[in-house]
């Protein structure tokens, strides 16, 4: 559970949602709840790791929270679920872009970014319990699938610039160009840090030729790599600037400890949307706590 107040988060979530969604989907929509209100509630659910029923209960109990969201009535849990099913990934991406714009304000400096992925559980069962089950199960009963969440972050400001999610396990080497193109729309990029999973000559070329940035990606240890840039990485790897990549692990840790380590849902599409909303909720959380993260950055850099 997050440690900061619900009311400031709810207010900023509603402000951002209002910028990316019209009040109603069509002119025939019921004027009971606006789309920004429902999106703000979904972000609040990710922020507090609530279920749909828990969200309905908490809103019913918390009059000030309803006032912060400008709710005259409490949405039923089925209303929230139906809105989540209708919500598209483009809307969440626009919401993330709006948070980046607010977090960066008028900064124009180019940023160093890191890209990496992590696994999210789609249920409430702990990974410890799953591993214990695997110890007593045959090979066919092993837990093989999870949701993989890949993000691009500004390593200095520690905010999300782009994200995607898909069923894991699987390689994300081909997803790097698209993610970086989205990230570059929010902030100019000068340096890209990634681990060996994203190692490929086309990725290096995309970063250097298309984005005009420097790339640091370790070459996979399978003999002398092919490609000019990969060969340079193999023979003279820049260790010192690459250390900044560890900050993306700090962000993953903060999200899983303070917000949630789950992307709940019975269908893959719902799980993916829950993961993307988790990234949006994290940036909204950052909008409320810039000073805390300045202290974290200072501690890491010393």
Language-model regions, residue ranges each:
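A short glycine/serine-rich beta->alpha loop
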Residues: 24-30, 65-69, 137, 265-267
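Basic, amphipathic alpha-helical segments enriched in Lys/Arg and hydrophobic/aromatic residues
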Residues: 238-302
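DNA-recognition alpha helix
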Residues: 53-69
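Helix-centered, glycine/charged polyanion-binding patches within enzymatic domains
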Residues: 196-263
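Polybasic low-complexity intrinsically disordered regions
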Residues: 30-31, 35, 47, 82, ...
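Major-groove recognition helix of helix-turn-helix-like DNA-binding domains
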Residues: 68-87
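Basic, short loop/linker segments at the boundary and entry of helix-turn-helix/winged-helix-like folds
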Residues: 2-47
């Amino acid at each position: 559970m997050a440690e900061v107040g619900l009311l400031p988060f709810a207010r900023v979530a509603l402000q951002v949602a209002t910028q990316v969604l019209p009040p109603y989907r069509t002119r025939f929509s019921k004027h009971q709840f606006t789309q920004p209100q429902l999106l703000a509630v979904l972000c609040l659910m990710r922020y507090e790791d609530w279920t749909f029923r828990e969200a309905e209960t908490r809103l019913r109990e918390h009059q000030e929270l309803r006032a912060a969201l400008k709710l005259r009535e409490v949405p039923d849990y089925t209303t929230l679920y139906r809105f989540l099913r209708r919500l598209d990934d483009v809307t969440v991406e626009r919401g993330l872009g709006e948070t980046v714009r607010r977090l960066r304000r008028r900064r124009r400096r180019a940023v160093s970014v890191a890209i990496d992925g992590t696994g999210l559980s789609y249920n409430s069962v702990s990974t410890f319990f799953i591993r214990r089950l695997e110890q007593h199960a045959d090979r066919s009963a092993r837990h093989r699938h999870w949701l993989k969440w890949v993000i691009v972050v500004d390593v200095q400001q520690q905010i999300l610039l782009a994200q995607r999610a898909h069923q894991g396990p699987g390689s994300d080497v081909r997803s790097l160009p698209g993610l970086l193109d989205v990230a570059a729309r929010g902030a100019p990029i000068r340096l890209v840090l990634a681990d060996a999973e994203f190692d490929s000559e086309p990725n290096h070329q995309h970063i250097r030729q298309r984005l005009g940035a420097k790339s640091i990606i370790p070459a996979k240890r399978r003999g002398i790599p092919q490609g000019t840039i990969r060969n340079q990485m193999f023979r003279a790897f820049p260790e010192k600037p690459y250390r900044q990549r560890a900050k993306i692990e700090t962000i993953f840790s903060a999200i899983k400890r303070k917000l949630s380590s789950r992307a709940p849902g019975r269908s893959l599409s719902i799980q993916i949307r829950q993961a993307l909303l988790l990234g949006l909720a994290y940036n909204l959380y950052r909008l409320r706590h810039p000073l805390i993260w300045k202290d974290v950055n200072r501690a890491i850099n010393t």
